[in-house]
Amino acid sequence: VDDAHGVGTMGPRLGGTGQEQGVQDDIDVYFGTFAKSFALIGGFIAADPEIIGFLKYNTRSQIFAKSLPMPLVLGAQKRLEMMRDRPEFKEKLWTIVHALQSGLKNAGLDLGNTNSPVTPVYLKGGPAEASNLVVDLRENYGIFCSVVMYPVVPKGVIILRLIPTAVHTMEDVNYTVKAFSEIQSKLSQGLYDRENYAVGLGS
């Protein structure tokens, strides 16, 4: 199970989607990332010792690979402790997630069928629109989000991925919803077709 979006956000002890569904003990190989709920880099695989041993000696990416720097390992351990000992973080996170996702939906934005804090916003456009749009968001609204384009998604589709956290506020949510309403309006008007639109807007 690749549970990049579930670990640290779902389950009674934030153990992920399997824990949330009550099937964690039935998972043979469990993948997770430190790049989302842990706010770090790297990832992990959890499995029986025999499987881990096989992967260590047979996975090409492991050949000549180095361990994560110790500060990052210690940081991951500390975050894991906080996830287990501070249940209020989960409650705050999901309050923000539900507010953001419902706000975006009420504003007419398409979020698909997300069930995790990672919030995709589906828009229509090509590379030019996507480039101008994300620069506009970053430079003029102060909002950073990753963008997914073809060939990961069909041509003409743009996905912007927002990752709300437990330290965001309702003011952040309201600001983000307003910003996305505005960029959706600009996109529908064809304003992002203009070359260097987003950069020029802030000058």
Predicted region positions:
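A common structural junction motif
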Residues: 139-144, 180-188
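Short, ordered loop/turn segments at secondary-structure junctions
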Residues: 4-6, 49, 69, 150-152
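Conserved PLP-binding catalytic core of the aspartate aminotransferase-like
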Residues: 86-101, 105-141, 150-157, 164-166, ...
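Catalytic PLP-binding core of fold-type I/II PLP enzymes
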Residues: 1-13
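Short beta-strand
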Residues: 31, 65-66, 110-115
